[in-house]
Amino acid sequence: MPRSRINGNFIDKTSSIVANILLRIIPTTSGEKEAFTYYRDGMSAQSEGNYAEALQNYYEAMRLEIDPYDRSYILYNIGLIHTSNGEHTKALEYYFRALERNPFLPQAFNNMAVICHYRGEQAIRQGDSEIAEAWSDQAAEYWKQAIALTPGNYIEAHNWLKITRRFE
């Protein structure tokens, strides 16, 4: 039974019903419908913290999905899981891949900036100010891109850029 049919709460059930109706009425190929089903099941598993199951669904969705824009969101969600698991190098790889297909994902730029900022903080704790500065500069570049795409969002990042004199 697809995961979408076993969701427990009202909102999940409603979303699943709407998604199933859309899948029936929107003219798509069976492969696209199957890819969307795997993607939807991946999001459901991810929201429940079942990351291994979510990854399986996302990888299957990637195998079937041909649209670059849709693939960007699958890749982004895979990046989120790797971020949650502390696998920052893998997460960055998936965020990059998502942005190659869709350069208008401010959340990917933000998450990349957060990882770089975290690595900069780690370098400071280890006493390596040169490496810390490089990571912080990279974080600044990613945050600038996120802010440029969605002005008014990422207020804390905007303030950090001003405080550290990295905002142009």
Curated annotation (Swiss-Prot):
It is found in: Plastid, Chloroplast thylakoid membrane. One of its GO terms (cellular component) is chloroplast thylakoid membrane. Pfam families: TPR_1 (PF00515). TPR repeats lie at residues 35-68, 72-105, 120-153. It is a peripheral membrane protein. Keywords: Chloroplast, Membrane, Photosynthesis, Plastid, Repeat, Thylakoid, TPR repeat. GO terms for biological process: photosynthesis. PROSITE patterns: TPR (PS50005), TPR_REGION (PS50293). Essential for the assembly of the photosystem I (PSI) complex. May act as a chaperone-like factor to guide the assembly of the PSI subunits. Belongs to the Ycf3 family. NCBIfam families: PRK02603.1. This is Photosystem I assembly protein Ycf3. The gene is ycf3.
